[in-house]
């Protein structure tokens, strides 16, 4: 493969991993991954509601299953969704980098 042949070549400074990342996936797996990410980030629904200021807009979350990233009416959720998508993209790129380094 290209990685095996050129992965550790001293003249290679950069490697274009992939491109054209776009669009949001709201499948059940991605929605659950988002909820899990939020649990790690906030630790509790109380902390999440405080951070999102959800009580002000009468959007208080009482169960993790109520979190639906397709709902753009809660600004804090939309911002965290964008953070989550960025985290997932970076995680994907790190996996590609690791594969290239192993093959190189």
List where the protein language model places each region.
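Polysaccharide-binding and catalytic clefts of secreted carbohydrate-active enzymes
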Residues: 1-104
């Amino acid at each position: 493969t290209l990685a095996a042949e050129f992965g550790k070549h001293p003249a290679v400074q950069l490697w274009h991993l992939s491109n054209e990342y776009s669009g949001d996936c709201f499948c059940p797996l991605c929605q659950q991954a988002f909820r899990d990410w939020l649990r790690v980030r906030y630790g509790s629904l109380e902390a999440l509601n405080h951070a999102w200021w959800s009580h002000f807009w009468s959007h208080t979350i009482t169960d993790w299953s109520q979190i639906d990233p397709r709902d753009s009416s809660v600004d804090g959720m939309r911002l965290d969704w964008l953070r989550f998508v960025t985290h997932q993209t970076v995680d994907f790129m790190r996996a590609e980098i690791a594969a290239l380094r192993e093959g190189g």
